[in-house]
Amino acid sequence: MKLWKQCLWILAQAACTFAVAQPPVSAHEAEYGQAAAAYQKQDFATVIRLLQPLAEQGDATAQHNLAVLYQDGLGVPASAEKALYWYEKAATQGQAEAQFMAGLMYSDGNGMPQNYEKAAFWYRKAAEQGHADAQNNLAARYATGTGVAKDLAEALKWYRAAAAQGHPTAGHTLQQLERLPEAQKQPAR
């Protein structure tokens, strides 16, 4: 359900951006408006019909939203493989939420093999753009050495970044790590 709301939010943002821009900034303005309206009505077949061509043309927002539909099985059979395909398409274009979701899919391995190195790769890409959940997850990777070399100094860096944005888990974990002796917090060599 959270992904469904997230997709609606991204579609609404795209529609609003197109609606207030003068002159129209994209040939896709009408499609985004129609897709957002169909999404609100839970007419997912129409959403897919409108987003699929945009995604195939390389539109990162459409690619991300199509991934959400495949992940949640909205208007299409649920497919982790197709969801990951579209997340990675959007992620390679720099879309932080798609980068985070690709990392999450590789981390969780739901419907696909786990790959902690790829999870860390995508978490880092999103974390570098300020995505708090990705910063927290990347920090956890460094704290445990999962998919990356264990490095508490790097973990602290990313926990601090996430906590600065109000991420509750990061703040709690940061407090615990800050209590460690300084020697344990030094960068790995």
How does the language model describe each region?
Residues 64-65, 97-101, 133-137, 152, ...:
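Alpha-solenoid helical repeat scaffolds
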Residues 26, 31, 39-43, 56-59, ...:
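Short helix-capping/linker turns of helical repeat alpha-solenoids
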Residues 31-38, 50-54, 65-72, 101-108, ...:
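Hydrophobic face of amphipathic alpha-helices that form TPR/SEL1-like repeat modules
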Residues 53-54, 89-90, 125-126, 161-162:
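Canonical positions in the second alpha-helix
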Residues 13-50, 189:
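N-terminal leader/linker segments that initiate helical-solenoid repeat arrays
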Residues 3, 24, 28, 149, ...:
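Terminal, low-structured helical/coil segments at or just beyond the last alpha-helical repeat
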Residues 1-10:
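Bacterial N-terminal signal peptides that target proteins for export
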Residues 40-49, 77-89, 113-122, 149-158, ...:
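Structural signature of tandem alpha-helical TPR/SEL1-like repeats
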